[in-house]
Amino acid sequence: MSIPITNFTQKEFCCKCGCGSCEVSMKLKETLQIIRNYWGKPIIITSSRRCRTHNARVGGVPNSQHLLGTAADITTEGSIQTFYNFIIQLYKSGKIPDLGYIQLYLNKKFIHVDVRYPKSNTVRNLK
């Protein structure tokens, strides 16, 4: 199944250091687009693809899904907790089957989502 990616540009997925690393999984793009379609409001990608240098600079783990282009940190206007709960409901209802992992960073106001395989089946809330 191919979903048109209408609300995100390729540049939004690129490493924030400017190195030009932009390759991300189509499953990640489609998962984010599905979330955006149901949410009906803009979603901001604060981090997606990372090169090893930038990943180390921001404190990412050495085996980060960001290095593989299978993860994104996202936020939106309003309550991040409400947005997180919304994504969980989409997953539970089968709307985003490729979601492999989700973690809420409440104090930092972003949500990490990835499409790792095999799925970790772990949902984490960090405050």
Enumerate the language-model features and the residues they cover.
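A short linear-motif detector with a strong N-terminal bias
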Residues: 23-25, 52-55, 90-94
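Catalytic cores and adjacent binding grooves of peptidoglycan-active enzymes
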Residues: 63, 67-71, 76-127
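Generic alpha-helical scaffold signal
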Residues: 22-29, 48, 68, 77
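Residue-identity detector for threonine
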Residues: 6-9, 31, 46, 53, ...
